[in-house]
Amino acid sequence: PKVQAAEQTPEQILAKMNLDQKVGQLLWTHVYGDSADDTTYASDNQAIFGPGVSTPAQAVKKYHLGGVLYFNWAHNFSSENTDVTKVAALSNGLQAAAKADGNVPLGITIDQEGGMVSRVGAPATIFPGNMALGATGNQALAYSQGQVLGCEMRSLGINADFAPVLDVNTNPNNPVIGLRAISDDPNLVAQLGGAQIQGIQSQGVSATAKHFPGHGDADTDSHLGLPRVTYSRQVLNQHLVPFKTAINGGVDMIMTAHIVV
């Protein structure tokens, strides 16, 4: 039988890229439109990317983007009764644009945590959220939830999920984490969060441990202001427990928090 040639190594790919392409790989952003060639939101895309960039595909090509992040407010899809076929077609179109530009696969990401932060709605599976998962204390259930999240996102052409939340929920007045957190027990967060990560990544989708080094003690919504956490090093070490477990378990990505520690 014919022997298939080995894929190029990262070093071989980098050797063929110019400086602009290398810089572009560091950029992950949103694009407007529900298809790669959608011109409906040309003015929105031009406001971000400049003249001549009217479609999502043009943005990927011009700036050699490393990744895109899907949002319903960017008109990539509707969060209610999501047309999954169109989302998959959008992903395929953007990957084709990336391949034509430099043959480097595009990172396509989303915040699909389950619970209150679930960008894709029905027919995707709707989960009750991490606090409910934490109440079960069941690692097998956490792994299964991760599997479902990974499987469904992969079917949409999404290859990285900005989940799970590994914040230790030590502040009951936290306005932005709350139900998104598994528990106020760092060891339980580590166990169930680690299981979620393994479940997501078992489906060929990268999981993301967030929000490093821990957003669970904040009292400000980081989307509206800059939270400051002033706990001791001993307390910080407790917030780091789930992230250490995730790193040792081989999590693909880590998202930093918008906080001052």
Give residue ranges: language-model regions.
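Sec-dependent signal peptide cleavage junction
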Residues: P1-T9, W73
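Mature N-terminal segment immediately following signal peptide/propeptide cleavage
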Residues: A6-D38, K61
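Alpha-helical scaffolding within the catalytic cores
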Residues: T9-L14, P51-A57, N237-K244
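Short, well-ordered coil/turn segments that N-cap beta-strands
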Residues: Q25, G66, G102-L106, I158-N159, ...
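Enzymes and membrane/adaptor proteins characterized by extended Gly/Ser/Thr/Asp/Glu-rich
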Residues: Y32-F49, Q58-L192, H211, G216-T230, ...
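Histidine-centered catalytic micro-motifs
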Residues: A209, V241, T256
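Oxyanion-binding "anion nests"
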Residues: A246, V251-V261
